[in-house]
């Protein structure tokens, strides 16, 4: 509702999803038809469950492995854990929750970049940070290296930003020249297992500190300070 700046979901849909999750957890098995229905319900409810997208993609990925007309298949352990995560969130879900968007919420802006063979950098107003890759981090993919400083920043400064906002939910706008991560973070989804783990950690931090992390793509030539920091040239 744009007039009240709130998101409202039907309690009927929430209760139906909880019943479906409970049924799956009791039986430990699912058919494609049942699981497809649940995926659709959770996609609808995700708009009201803050920072929940990273816990949704595995369901759609698993759905693609199910076939029509086949016997119900046993649910893998990681999916059972995700079902319990959704069950817990839906049990405490308010029918109406406030919007979090840059137009009406507190905002902080940072700029980040990563150098594949050196390190990464973050520019936050008058504060600048840089990190030299460890031997193991050097083996990571480019999207992983671009995503890591964002998660590290929220882990380190999330509580400070939350206090600055007086406990209100707000938006952390991250300006990055990574198109891949602009999509991944905003969608809460990545096909890379390493990046998916970082997105889950980021989602957990967003819920803890009341931050909605929104990536805004920035051309490389407009991201000079973060680029120089990532190369330890500044």
Set out the residue ranges of the language-model regions.
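A short, polar/acidic, helix/strand-boundary loop motif
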Residues: 22-23, 124-148, 156, 180-189, ...
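Mobile genetic element proteins and their domesticated derivatives, centered on retroelements
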Residues: 17, 39-40, 59, 113, ...
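RNase H catalytic domain
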Residues: 154-224
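A short acidic-Thr-Gly-centered motif at the start of a beta-strand
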Residues: 95-105, 164-166
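C-terminal functional segments of enzyme domains
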Residues: 1-6, 42, 48, 209-234
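Short secondary-structure boundary/capping segments
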Residues: 53, 187-195, 229-234
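C-terminal reverse transcriptase regions that engage the nucleic-acid substrate
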Residues: 1-99
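Two-metal-ion RNase H-like nuclease active-site motif
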Residues: 105-117
């Amino acid at each position: 509702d744009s007039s009240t700046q709130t998101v409202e979901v039907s309690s009927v849909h929430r209760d139906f999803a909880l019943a479906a999750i409970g049924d799956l957890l009791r039986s430990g098995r699912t058919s494609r038809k049942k699981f497809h229905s649940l995926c659709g319900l959770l996609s609808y409810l995700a708009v009201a469950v803050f920072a929940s997208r990273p816990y949704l993609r595995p369901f759609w990925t698993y759905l693609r492995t199910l076939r029509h007309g086949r016997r119900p298949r046993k649910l893998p352990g990681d999916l059972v854990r995700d079902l319990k995560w959704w069950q817990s969130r839906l049990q405490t879900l308010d029918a109406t929750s406030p919007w979090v968007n840059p137009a009406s919420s507190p905002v902080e802006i940072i700029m980040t970049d990563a150098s594949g063979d050196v390190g990464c950098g973050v520019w936050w107003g008058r504060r600048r940070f840089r990190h030299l890759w460890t031997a193991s981090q050097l083996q990571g993919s480019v999207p992983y290296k671009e995503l890591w400083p964002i998660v590290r920043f929220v882990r380190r400064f999330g509580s400070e930003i939350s206090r600055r906002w007086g406990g209100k939910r707000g938006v952390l706008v991250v300006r990055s020249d990574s198109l891949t991560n602009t999509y991944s973070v905003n969608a809460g989804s990545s096909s890379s297992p390493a990046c998916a783990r970082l997105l889950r950690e980021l989602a957990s931090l967003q819920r803890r500190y009341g931050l909605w992390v929104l990536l805004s793509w920035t051309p490389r030539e407009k991201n000079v300070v973060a680029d120089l920091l990532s190369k330890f040239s500044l």
